[in-house]
Amino acid sequence: MKKNIHPDYHPVVFKDASTGHQFLTRSTATSDRTVEWEDGNEYPLIVVDVTSESHPFWTGAQRVMDTAGRVEKFQRRYGNRLRRAKK
């Protein structure tokens, strides 16, 4: 591999802003903020808005959209135009 072309890949702690959940992983992201981890070492801290701990898809709090109502609304609005264009 070529030297000096790859970014610095190091341990980083990511923190979910809404839940406070933290996890240690590796990343090229950097930060001036640090946090002491469970192993006693200090790591850069990156605060993110959404993680799997707070995203509706992963928490099971997602909403099911009313697709039938949206299709009917589309048909009412554009249905006649499409039929006339085919003739």
UniProtKB/Swiss-Prot annotation:
SUPFAM superfamilies: L28p-like. One of its GO terms (molecular function) is structural constituent of ribosome. It holds the Pfam family Ribosomal_L31. The keyword Ubl conjugation does not apply. InterPro entries: Ribosomal_bL28/bL31-like_sf, Ribosomal_bL31, Ribosomal_bL31_B, Ribosomal_bL31_sf. It comes from the Bacteria. Keywords: Ribonucleoprotein, Ribosomal protein. GO terms for cellular component: ribonucleoprotein complex; ribosome. One of its GO terms (biological process) is translation. NCBIfam families: L31, PRK00528.1, PRK01678.1. Part of the 50S ribosomal subunit. Belongs to the bacterial ribosomal protein bL31 family. Type B subfamily. This is Large ribosomal subunit protein bL31B. It comes from Corynebacterium kroppenstedtii (strain DSM 44385 / JCM 11950 / CIP 105744 / CCUG 35717). The gene is rpmE2.
